[in-house]
């Protein structure tokens, strides 16, 4: 099974830039798009896959996984979340901060449901929309540029929601929870999968989602839970998914940056060390909106 970590050298380093974005005059939305946006993304993705023997005619959610599942655990984590959500073809799911749509396509292909994804970064949306057509998924996956704090959809539109490795860049956890609650139908579930603070140590930057502390919004699981409860959600489950992840991240960094000095400048070495030291943990939180589906 292919995961983001099975092809470490073609992961984050090839597709994502790490500019300094601490200018106080820059809005958070602008900073996020500057951090993640980089022209020519689709060409780089297809070229990378071609170098691995995967042609444009072979594109599926599985063959694309090495270059479009940008969260700890990759496609395996997406499958795990899908199993825990228990989706059906008649469901409508919203992916808050969808990136290029990798998880959205995987969820739609496996469950048969329709997925709507929203992301601030235009390059991600344009690339993902093209990939939807190239994989034959355009009828079940739709992507649009928008802030996850202000999604252009009516109240109670979706059966379920996911947010995968997005909250680390968004300080307004209360706003995230309020918007997810608004979008969900009664009985709907919201899966948050983020890297969360679990220990007392200070974070060393850069990290995969931030070049410096001004762009990082990592908090403890309790902060997510408090925001969720305040929005009206009920806690259903919480899972620490750290097991084995530090080793995978170290392997990924070693393969992708063999010539880079070990001086704290590699985001994956830093993240792997923090997970190993229990400073942070990839954590899933499942919340439910009261009422019957």
Task: Please report, for each region that a protein language model flagged, where it lies by residue.
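N-terminal auxiliary segments of SAM/dcSAM-dependent transferases
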Residues: 11, 15-50
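Class I SAM-dependent methyltransferase SAM/SAH-binding core
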Residues: 92-150
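A short acidic, Gly/Pro-enriched loop at the edge of an enzyme's catalytic core
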Residues: 149-161
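A short SAM/SAH-binding and catalytic strip from SAM-dependent methyltransferases
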Residues: 160-172
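A short glycine-rich, Lys/Arg-flanked "PGG" loop and its adjoining helix->strand segment in the class I
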Residues: 174-189
